[in-house]
């Protein structure tokens, strides 16, 4: 009986050696169960600090953008990778951009959005064509925000989309230049 292998270990080693790898040590890790972000009392992660958050009441990933604008001030650049969003979120981002609270915006969305949410997709395409924001898409289920502010670069990632969410979601909220660059695709 011949043995069958699912992969060749030598080719796997070559593949791993070509992979992008990043390592960073986080000095502080906080675990929090929150009903709302206000419970952080204006606290932001320090450099190389990460908050692991579990929601106890429904709030979306978008809430972090609002929280950062209130505590850190103007957002110079906002990169959002998401599976889903809605008109209300898009309108809020555009309003803040027109008020100068947000500089440039890059939305990276799931390419399935054009089938699942055709009106939202068309609106985003038009905004991209008009030069209001940058739009990219891929077969993706990511939920990440990279937020560049005057006081530092923050990353939020977790299970929540930029729209309606379940009561229980999980997020990692951190301040790190290298993770920001990695998640925003700036160091490729």
Spans of features found by a protein language model:
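Primarily the HKD phosphodiesterase
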Residues: 61-128
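Conserved beta-strand termini and adjacent loop/short-helix elements that scaffold enzyme active sites
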Residues: 54-55, 108-110, 135-138
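Aromatic-residue detector
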Residues: 38-41, 60, 81, 89, ...
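N-terminal localization/anchoring segments of enzymes in phospholipid and broader phosphate metabolism
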Residues: 1-75, 98-99, 148, 153, ...
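HKD (HxKxxxxD) catalytic microenvironment of the phospholipase D
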Residues: 78, 132-185
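Short, flexible loop segments at the rims of nucleotide/cofactor-binding pockets, characterized by
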Residues: 52-58, 82-85, 133-134
């Amino acid at each position: 009986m011949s043995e069958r292998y699912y992969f060749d270990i030598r080719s796997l080693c070559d593949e791993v050696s070509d992979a992008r790898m990043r390592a960073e040590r986080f000095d502080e890790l906080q675990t929090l169960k929150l009903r709302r972000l206000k419970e952080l009392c204006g606290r932001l992660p320090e450099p190389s600090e990460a908050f692991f958050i579990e929601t106890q009441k429904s709030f979306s990933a978008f809430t972090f953008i609002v929280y950062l604008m209130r505590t850190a001030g103007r957002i110079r650049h906002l990169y959002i990778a998401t599976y889903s969003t809605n008109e209300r979120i898009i309108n809020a981002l555009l309003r803040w951009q027109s008020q100068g609270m947000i500089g440039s915006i890059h939305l990276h969305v799931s390419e399935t959005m054009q089938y699942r949410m055709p009106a939202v997709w068309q609106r985003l395409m038009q905004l991209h064509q008009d030069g209001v924001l940058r739009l990219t898409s891929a077969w993706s289920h990511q939920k990440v925000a990279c937020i560049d502010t005057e006081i530092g670069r923050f990353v939020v990632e977790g299970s929540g989309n930029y729209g309606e969410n379940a009561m229980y979601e999980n997020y990692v909220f951190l301040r790190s230049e290298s993770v920001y660059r990695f998640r925003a695709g700036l160091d490729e």
